[in-house]
Amino acid sequence: MEKIFKVTSDSGIHARPATLLVNTASKFGSDINLEYNGKNVNLKSIMGVMSLGIQQNAEIKITANGDDAAQALAAIEETMKNEGLGE
Protein backbone atom coordinates (compact mmCIF):
# COMPACT_ATOMS: atom_id res chain seq x y z
CA MET A 1 0.00 0.00 0.00
CA GLU A 2 1.19 3.52 -0.63
CA LYS A 3 0.15 7.10 -0.11
CA ILE A 4 1.55 10.36 -1.44
CA PHE A 5 1.67 13.43 0.78
CA LYS A 6 2.49 17.07 0.08
CA VAL A 7 4.58 18.58 2.88
CA THR A 8 2.86 21.79 4.01
CA SER A 9 4.93 22.62 7.11
CA ASP A 10 6.94 25.84 6.67
CA SER A 11 10.09 24.12 7.91
CA GLY A 12 9.58 20.80 6.12
CA ILE A 13 10.32 17.53 7.91
CA HIS A 14 13.02 18.55 10.40
CA ALA A 15 14.05 16.81 13.65
CA ARG A 16 10.82 17.07 15.70
CA PRO A 17 8.36 16.02 12.99
CA ALA A 18 10.76 13.34 11.75
CA THR A 19 10.81 11.91 15.28
CA LEU A 20 7.00 11.91 15.41
CA LEU A 21 6.78 10.05 12.09
CA VAL A 22 9.46 7.52 13.10
CA ASN A 23 7.73 6.90 16.44
CA THR A 24 4.39 6.39 14.68
CA ALA A 25 5.88 4.00 12.11
CA SER A 26 7.74 2.06 14.79
CA LYS A 27 4.45 1.03 16.43
CA PHE A 28 3.73 -1.28 13.48
CA GLY A 29 5.24 -4.53 12.28
CA SER A 30 4.95 -3.69 8.58
CA ASP A 31 7.91 -2.58 6.49
CA ILE A 32 7.37 1.16 6.03
CA ASN A 33 9.45 3.27 3.66
CA LEU A 34 9.56 6.93 2.72
CA GLU A 35 10.57 7.98 -0.78
CA TYR A 36 11.66 11.50 -1.66
CA ASN A 37 13.64 12.85 -4.57
CA GLY A 38 14.53 9.37 -5.84
CA LYS A 39 15.80 8.15 -2.46
CA ASN A 40 14.05 5.50 -0.40
CA VAL A 41 14.61 5.13 3.36
CA ASN A 42 13.12 3.12 6.21
CA LEU A 43 10.55 5.34 7.96
CA LYS A 44 11.54 3.70 11.25
CA SER A 45 15.05 5.21 10.94
CA ILE A 46 15.44 8.77 12.23
CA MET A 47 18.83 9.11 10.50
CA GLY A 48 17.36 7.90 7.22
CA VAL A 49 14.46 10.35 7.36
CA MET A 50 16.68 13.27 8.40
CA SER A 51 19.16 12.49 5.61
CA LEU A 52 16.53 13.33 2.98
CA GLY A 53 16.29 17.04 3.88
CA ILE A 54 12.57 17.21 3.04
CA GLN A 55 11.45 20.81 2.44
CA GLN A 56 8.07 22.54 2.33
CA ASN A 57 5.96 21.73 -0.77
CA ALA A 58 7.85 18.46 -1.33
CA GLU A 59 5.92 15.38 -2.41
CA ILE A 60 6.78 12.28 -0.44
CA LYS A 61 5.58 8.73 -0.94
CA ILE A 62 5.10 6.41 2.01
CA THR A 63 4.73 2.70 1.35
CA ALA A 64 3.78 0.02 3.84
CA ASN A 65 3.88 -3.75 3.36
CA GLY A 66 2.74 -6.23 5.97
CA ASP A 67 -0.18 -7.43 8.05
CA ASP A 68 -0.88 -4.02 9.56
CA ALA A 69 0.00 -1.87 6.52
CA ALA A 70 -3.43 -0.22 6.27
CA GLN A 71 -3.42 0.71 9.95
CA ALA A 72 0.14 2.00 9.68
CA LEU A 73 -0.66 4.28 6.73
CA ALA A 74 -3.78 5.56 8.49
CA ALA A 75 -1.78 6.39 11.64
CA ILE A 76 0.96 8.11 9.62
CA GLU A 77 -1.64 10.13 7.72
CA GLU A 78 -3.23 11.15 11.02
CA THR A 79 0.17 12.25 12.38
CA MET A 80 0.91 14.24 9.21
CA LYS A 81 -2.43 16.07 9.42
CA ASN A 82 -2.59 16.54 13.20
CA GLU A 83 0.92 18.01 13.33
CA GLY A 84 0.38 20.27 10.31
CA LEU A 85 3.10 18.47 8.35
CA GLY A 86 1.24 17.59 5.19
CA GLU A 87 -1.88 16.58 3.39
Curated annotation (Swiss-Prot):
Subcellular location: Cytoplasm
Any single Gene Ontology cellular-component annotation: cytoplasm
Post-translational modification: The form phosphorylated at the tele nitrogen (N(epsilon)2), instead of the expected pros nitrogen (N(delta)1), of His-14 is not able to transfer its phosphoryl group to the B.subtilis EIIA-Glc domain. This form may be inactive in PTS-catalyzed sugar transport or target an as yet unknown acceptor molecule in an alternative metabolic process.
SUPFAM superfamilies associated with the record: HPr-like
Effect of H14A: Not histidine-phosphorylated
Limits of the HPr domain: 1-87
Active site positions: H14
Biological processes per GO annotation: phosphoenolpyruvate-dependent sugar phosphotransferase system
Positions of modified residues (Tele-phosphohistidine): H14
Keyword annotations from UniProtKB, A to Z: Cytoplasm, Phosphoprotein, Phosphotransferase system, Sugar transport, Transcription, Transcription regulation, Transport
Residue numbers carrying Phosphoserine: S45
InterPro entries: HPr, HPr-like, HPr-like_sf, PTS_HPr_His_P_site, PTS_HPr_Ser_P_site
Record-annotated membrane-spanning stretches: none
Activity regulation as described: Phosphorylation on Ser-45 inhibits the phosphoryl transfer from enzyme I to HPr.
Database matches in NCBIfam families: PRK13780.1, PTS_HPr_family
Similarity annotation: Belongs to the HPr family.
Function: General (non sugar-specific) component of the phosphoenolpyruvate-dependent sugar phosphotransferase system (sugar PTS). This major carbohydrate active-transport system catalyzes the phosphorylation of incoming sugar substrates concomitantly with their translocation across the cell membrane. The phosphoryl group from phosphoenolpyruvate (PEP) is transferred to the phosphoryl carrier protein HPr by enzyme I. Phospho-HPr then transfers it to the PTS EIIA domain.
Protein name in the entry: Phosphocarrier protein HPr
Organism: Bacillus thuringiensis subsp. israelensis
